[in-house]
Regions:
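Glycine-rich phosphate-binding active-site loops on the catalytic face of alpha/beta enzymes
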Residues: 91-104, 179-188, 238-256
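Catalytic cores of alpha/beta
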Residues: 29-35, 72, 77-92, 96, ...
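Alpha-helix-loop-beta-strand connector modules within alpha/beta enzyme cores
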Residues: 53-80, 84, 112-118, 146-149, ...
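N-terminal amphipathic alpha-helix/helix-capping segment at the start of soluble metabolic enzymes
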Residues: 1-20, 135-151, 206-207, 213-214, ...
Length: 286
């Protein structure tokens, strides 16, 4: 069974860094893995993306090639099925959206852990399979397989009013490793749609972080730029997921397109010396 880089870092008390993709193109995962070793995992935000079971297998292969862990974000109605298939494809962490109750939280843990007595990290319902994670038929049903399910990282979204109201009881469910506050959904659930900076939203986020840290659960924060991490680091947060592929591309196309249109519609100016133009052209390909 493949070592779980994210689990190893969590158990060692080390900080972790991930990034999000909505694309199922495996090359993106390889590029992230080749980005200087800075990323511990890739979150495939499947809640918002179209994908097939074959896509999950191919992403799993790319994760192995890149030497990084994979996390998948799944929607509420698909907890068990998508978690099971993603882990079988080679993902080693599952982020569960829309948790509201203790029973929801128990369902999240059960969708990941092995159905065997004595689990270190919560009750499970997952059985033996013949999938990529076990080499199809090489390690299925082995003690190493059950241990790998026990090591899979279970993450829940705290993003609903009901979840925040039940937060203490939810976080006491055995087997939850990490929490992620979702300001957009939470603001909607309290009637402040789109107002992520509302005082009640900030209060709920702080409550989530403090409640998690109190229990030894790891709070994770999603950011777009490194400069946003500082206030959270001061609170004790060590786990971040930075950037989304769609956001990176959208921002590039918008800003670069705007700049180019400005250049193309600007009044003609005196051309630069030939040597300078040639140098600029060469720089493009460096």
């Amino acid at each position: 069974m493949r070592a779980n880089r994210l689990r190893q870092k969590l158990d060692a008390g080390l900080p972790t860094l991930g990034t999000h993709i909505l694309s199922t193109w495996p090359t993106l995962v390889e590029l992230i893995g080749a980005a200087g070793g800075h990323y511990d995992y890739v979150e495939f935000t499947a809640e918002y993306a179209p994908f097939t079971m074959h896509d999950l297998d191919n992403l799993g292969r790319a994760l192995e090639l890149g030497g990084i862990a994979g996390m998948i974000k799944v929607e509420q109605s698909e907890y068990t099925h998508q978690a099971m298939r993603a882990i079988g494809s080679g993902f080693q962490s599952v982020l569960f959206a829309d948790v509201r109750t203790v029973e929801d939280a128990k369902s999240c843990v059960a969708a990941v852990r092995a159905e065997t007595p004595g689990n270190r990290r919560g009750f499970g319902l997952t059985g033996v399979g013949m999938r990529r994670d076990v080499g199809t038929n090489r390690e299925g049903g082995s003690p190493a397989y059950a241990a790998a399910l026990d090591d899979a990282v279970v993450v829940i979204m705290v993003e609903k009013r009901q979840c925040v109201e039940n937060l203490d009881a939810i976080l006491d469910v055995p087997g939850i490793d990490m929490v992620q506050f979702g300001g957009s959904d939470y603001s909607m659930s309290i009637g402040q749609t789109g107002n992520r900076t509302h005082a009640d939203v900030r209060k709920a986020e702080l409550k989530t972080i403090e409640a998690a840290l109190k229990r030894g659960i790891h709070p994770r924060v999603e950011i777009a730029e490194p400069e946003q991490a500082g206030p959270y680091i001061e609170l004790g947060v060590k786990h971040f997921c930075i950037g989304w592929d769609v956001g990176i591309l959208s921002n590039f196309w918008r800003t670069r397109g705007e700049t180019m249109q400005g250049l193309l519609t600007a009044p003609a100016s005196k051309p630069k010396a030939k040597s300078q133009s040639a140098k600029a052209a060469q720089d493009i390909y460096r």
